[in-house]
Amino acid sequence: MAQIFNFSSGPAMLPAEVLKQAQQELRDWNGLGTSVMEVSHRGKEFIQVAEEAEKDFRDLLNVPSNYKVLFCHGGGRGQFAAVPLNILGDKTTADYVDAGYWAASAIKEAKKYCTPNVFDAKVTVDGLRAVKPMREWQLSDNAAYMHYCPNETIDGIAIDETPDFGKDVVVAADFSSTILSRPIDVSRYGVIYAGAQKNIGPAGLTIVIVREDLLGKANIACPSILDYSILNDNDSMFNTPPTFAWYLSGLVFKWLKANGGVAAMDKINQQKAELLYGVIDNSDFYRNDVAKANRSRMNVPFQLADSALDKLFLEESFAAGLHALKGHRVVGGMRASIYNAMPLEGVKALTDFMVEFERRHG
């Protein structure tokens, strides 16, 4: 079978080595004669999986000891509610920075629980979409926390700055599409959350990193499965967790460690992004409308000069083994999501196709 490269924004491509191991272990895991999907989450065998996954994740991101790591249900949208429900405390407002679709979605959900102070960070510079630098973000004095999304998958916009708003500002961030792709100074954040389906593992699992002094503040109406304190007190097993997603994510963590960790991913991801943006920038046939300072390394949207060719581009790229390149309905065009599991050879295959397609149709 020909090599297939999956450029889906999520659920996304998983490392081939991880899928191969999961396939080999699927029906007889650890010599038990059963699948990991069939064992009790409270049995010693799965407890070991959970403990190793947390340890490896902590190692990969150098998570400080005063932070808890939770393995949850609900995805990023669940955390849009969980963040205000857990850390508002006795305050009624929080700062929200709007830089794209997912930040706006978090704001919409937060309005159910508080009065968001919304700062629109979106700007246009020389006809290109950009984000105001953090030094220009206008935060309020009475906010319980500040929330932003470092990587907007749909808009292809990234905020790569590290927050530095002082120790009194609790920063909450949606890292769903950029977690583990580059080093993070976890100590600059109060809460980091990420849906698994892009850079961690299969859909169904969400990881939360929360500073321990923020526990114990949950609203009385907070559902128990979203309550950080309850999840922490029960080792993320207050109810039956998504065990297979947890197991597979653990395999991804081991794959990452075996391949140089987050620092190595950072370098490879930079190479992949430079290759793809280079083809776009050196062409009149393709275009990307995001300012270079805010271009995402994970999600690269681009348009063809003649949108009438979009359908043909998608058909021919799919036939060439380059799948899921259709852009989000909100922005149209194309989008290549090049998360950790996408090898450099996959991006090279895409850029070779793009050059050849332009030669034939440009």
Swiss-Prot record:
One of its GO terms (biological process) is pyridoxine biosynthetic process. The gene is serC. L-glutamate binds at S9, R42. Pyridoxal 5'-phosphate binds at G76, R77, W102, T153, D174, Q197, N239, T240. Keywords: Amino-acid biosynthesis, Aminotransferase, Cytoplasm, Pyridoxal phosphate, Pyridoxine biosynthesis, Serine biosynthesis, Transferase. It is found in: Cytoplasm. Its EC number is 2.6.1.52. This is Phosphoserine aminotransferase.
